Amino acid sequence: MLSRFSSQLRFISAVRPVIPKFQPLRFYSVARPDAEKRILKVVSSFDKIQDPKKVTPTSTFANDLGLDSLDAVEVVMAIEEEFSIQIPDKDADEITSVGDAISYITKNPEAK
């Protein structure tokens, strides 16, 4: 009787459970084209921008758009509101162009 079960036991011991490997993935909340479009819209609609056609992904706030540092802070705050995130002051100080804002948003997984 034991021999009858021994063949089944060998089969059962040969079967190993399948454990899926964890593969880390990085998910971005906002795709770059969507982030670019939304940021361009936010910056273009800012009151102190006199020519919205000058707003491009390569525009700098101070040189190309004529914004002072307080205006740049207001633009960053508008971007925070648009994407429902809080940008730390240290990071906000480094956002000096539309391109910087786009890069920051696409790298931030909390952006919506």
UniProtKB/Swiss-Prot annotation:
Post-translational modification remark: 4'-phosphopantetheine is transferred from CoA to a specific serine of apo-ACP by acpS. This modification is essential for activity because fatty acids are bound in thioester linkage to the sulfhydryl of the prosthetic group.
Family: Belongs to the acyl carrier protein (ACP) family.
Residues with PTM O-(pantetheine 4'-phosphoryl)serine: 69
Protein name: Putative acyl carrier protein, mitochondrial
Pathway in which this enzyme or protein is active: Lipid metabolism; fatty acid biosynthesis
Transmembrane feature ranges: none
A GO term from the CC aspect: mitochondrion
This protein's UniProt keywords: Electron transport, Fatty acid biosynthesis, Fatty acid metabolism, Lipid biosynthesis, Lipid metabolism, Mitochondrion, Phosphopantetheine, Phosphoprotein, Transit peptide, Transport
Keyword Metal-binding listed: no
SUPFAM superfamilies: ACP-like (SSF47336)
Residues annotated as transit peptide in the record: 1-28
Gene Ontology BP annotations: [2Fe-2S] cluster assembly; fatty acid biosynthetic process
Function according to Swiss-Prot or TrEMBL: Carrier of the growing fatty acid chain in fatty acid biosynthesis. May be involved in the synthesis of very-long-chain fatty acids.
Highest rank taxon of the organism: Eukaryota
Any one Gene Ontology molecular-function term assigned to this protein's record: acyl carrier activity
InterPro entries attached to this UniProt entry: ACP, ACP-like_sf, PP-bd_ACP, Ppantetheine_attach_site
UniProt organism field: Schizosaccharomyces pombe (strain 972 / ATCC 24843) (Fission yeast)
HAMAP family recorded: Acyl_carrier
